[in-house]
Curated annotation (Swiss-Prot):
PANTHER family, per database record: DNA-DIRECTED RNA POLYMERASE SUBUNIT OMEGA
Role: Promotes RNA polymerase assembly. Latches the N- and C-terminal regions of the beta' subunit thereby facilitating its interaction with the beta and alpha subunits.
Catalytic activity: RNA(n) + a ribonucleoside 5'-triphosphate = RNA(n+1) + diphosphate
Family of this protein: Belongs to the RNA polymerase subunit omega family.
The protein's name in its UniProt record: DNA-directed RNA polymerase subunit omega
Gene name, Swiss-Prot/TrEMBL: rpoZ
Amino acid sequence: MLNPPLNQLTSQIKSKYLIATTAAKRAREIDEQPETELLSEYHSFKPVGRALEEIADGKIRPVISSDYYGKE
């Protein structure tokens, strides 16, 4: 079972693809620098789970550049 639930994650970030890429980037950061934790308590022991918890809590947002939407 996914914790946090997918509907809680999609309330913060609408795209499942952006959730996955944002969580992966943040998980790498947590793995390389464990002292960068943003929450006082985590339910997950793994970096990806911790990243998903941060997304669900609204601590992490993806940075979308203007070229993502085809604008220059």
